[in-house]
Curated annotation (Swiss-Prot):
<keyword id="KW-0964">Secreted</keyword>
<comment type="function">
    <text>Participates in the degradation of poly-3-hydroxybutyrate (PHB). It works downstream of poly(3-hydroxybutyrate) depolymerase, hydrolyzing D(-)-3-hydroxybutyrate oligomers of various length (3HB-oligomers) into 3HB-monomers.</text>
</comment>
<protein>
    <recommendedName>
        <fullName>D-(-)-3-hydroxybutyrate oligomer hydrolase</fullName>
        <ecNumber>3.1.1.22</ecNumber>
    </recommendedName>
</protein>
<keyword id="KW-0732">Signal</keyword>
<comment type="pathway">
    <text>Lipid metabolism; butanoate metabolism.</text>
</comment>
<dbReference type="InterPro" id="IPR029058">
    <property type="entry name" value="AB_hydrolase_fold"/>
</dbReference>
<dbReference type="InterPro" id="IPR016582">
    <property type="entry name" value="OHBut_olig_hydro_put"/>
</dbReference>
<comment type="similarity">
    <text>Belongs to the D-(-)-3-hydroxybutyrate oligomer hydrolase family.</text>
</comment>
<feature type="active site" description="Charge relay system">
    <location>
        <position position="311"/>
    </location>
</feature>
<dbReference type="GO" id="GO:0047989">
    <property type="term" value="F:hydroxybutyrate-dimer hydrolase activity"/>
</dbReference>
<dbReference type="Pfam" id="PF10605">
    <property type="entry name" value="3HBOH"/>
</dbReference>
<dbReference type="GO" id="GO:0019605">
    <property type="term" value="P:butyrate metabolic process"/>
</dbReference>
<feature type="signal peptide">
    <location>
        <begin position="1"/>
        <end position="33"/>
    </location>
</feature>
<keyword id="KW-0378">Hydrolase</keyword>
<dbReference type="GO" id="GO:0005615">
    <property type="term" value="C:extracellular space"/>
</dbReference>
Amino acid sequence: MTAIRGGSRRAPGLALALLGGVLLGACHGDENAQVNALPGFVSGSVRKTAYDGASDDLLTAGLGKTGLGSDTRPGFANPAQPSAAELRRLAIYSNYRALVDITPNGGYGRFWGPNVDLAGNDTLGEGKIAGTEYLAYSDDGSGRKNVTLLVQVPASFDPANPCIVTATASGSRGVYGAIAAAGEWGLKRGCAVAYNDKGGGNGAHEIGTGVVTLIDGTLATASSAGSSSLFTASESSSTLAAFNSAFPNRYAYKHAHSQQNPEQDWGRVTLQAVEFAYWALNEQFGPVVDGTRHGIRYRPGDITTIAASVSNGGGSALAAAEQDTRGWITAVVVGEPQINVRMTPGVTVEQGGAPVPSFGRPLADYATLANLLQPCAAAAVAATGAPYLSALPMGVTQSIRTQRCATLAAAGLVSGADTASQASDALAQLHAAGYLADSDLLQAPMWDSQAMPAIAVTYANAYTRSRVTDNLCNFSFATTNPVTGAVAAPAVSPMTNLFGAGNGVPPTNGINLVFNGASGGVDHRLATPDASFAGAFCLRQLWTANQLGIGTNVDAVRVAANLQHKPAIIVHGRSDALVPVNHASRAYVAQNSATEGRASQLSFYEVTNGQHFDAFLSVPGFDTRFVPVHYYDEQALNLMWNHLKSGAPLPPSQVIRTVPRGGVPGAAPALSTANLPPIVQSPGANAIAVNAGVIDVPL
């Protein structure tokens, strides 16, 4: 590992970095300088590490296709103190598997995977990719932003034909969060990949011990880490000690508790990741100008750069393209983007020629509503046969659904004399709020898996700039007894492997979402018979009553849908119940057509039977009903590459009518091309009409 000196801060624990590293030096400068200089936002040292493509590599951390596909996750020589290299390996393993279906029947190793080349053929063996990584923080001088930036430069990079692909982390994942979604494609194409963790990352603070994570996942105390931690809660040590006495075994998380509303900066930090990649490429391939330092070979706009990723990372790519004033980004390709659009009057979303009931709502609105209603809507007749995605016994889950419906009815929030009618009304309200009937069977698993409660709580904290000590709406993050759900001390601290195994949004890695009642904190699902309705209702009221500054902070994350005439592709699954297509992609495309008019180069591909979590596709009931959106994300990247390099026209906006695998839940037949029709140049009746602020999607 080599470290390149940047700003005045130096992270502690550099001695724990990968063996064989070195430290290099460079000063900050401007883009007109002849000497390559670190961008001013880079703080501390840059860690440079070479990987041989055999024992370790950029894509699989030495695990190869077989290791990534194995259900046995990589271990640690010393489980109590894993090395940075071991944590990196686990992070790549965990994040890769979190975004794609890893089963052979589901397509791994055949349609995607390290062994599959860009033409879709099994030619790459274990798929290990040699190259170099550059790792650093971006900060504003406060030592509290500490956005992780990472650039991977494959050995196959051609300096005469340079390219960059961004891979901003999805969700609130760490810096490797989009390695499967965009990083893999970029590395195989021979491009440098520019990652960042969006300033949310996987940073946590164990309140009882004061332990925090560092940039490489190793641990330190908050006092010794200082401004070099991924995240440290901002409260004083005395305040945290008092909080720990009243609420032991709690954890602060960066996305939820940094008080920075990090989402407002996601576009900016994605642009910084690109600029950092330019610096790294100049450092590696620029001429030597004074015997030691490198000159500038590439200036803004010289490198073909595709802003890509999925979910939150996809929204970040769109925001970056909108904010790009220096020509860093050439094109955009994103999947299922979580994006909050600033809608203007007259913009309309239609399906089959009729206006949809609701569109363009921000996440703070639809997520808090879904979190309130989904446990009840899950009992609706239309949701019968939904995949079951919970470790709780079915009887417990059914009781939660019945009790949530009853409490909603008592509060006047749903109508009906019995559970069935109350559940049908809850589902009807979700339809009226813009959720498609295509996602009816996903309302239950989105809540049962705790995806929606996790999002509602984390984003409510972020949008209100709450502190961990606020216990917003009586929710907090804690370790719990696996049987009773009550807050309890962990047998082993989850911090040890958090960087490698966590996803940044509790519940994750043994840190759970708890509701703090009169008898203490308990897993929110078990704290009350109606699964902490009071907390869910409180979260909803934050939005509906515009409390604690939530409206202002949500406005700060909205975008204008102005891509500045850059070629772009959005792919989204129609059945998405986490980021509903009416509120995200359809709304964005409609607003873009109003903003850019005929100058827009945006194509939108809506995938029937596609939903948000490809990693769920091996779950019984998911396997038979839903198809991988990732397959079309990769097709879209290939289409954009051909457009940029050979002038091939981008196919027009269209609905892609996929065919579910069918069969028996849990034993669906193998995925084949019969399930996955191609994106076509002439979609005919499947064409999506977009004009002057109106999008009309065929039924």
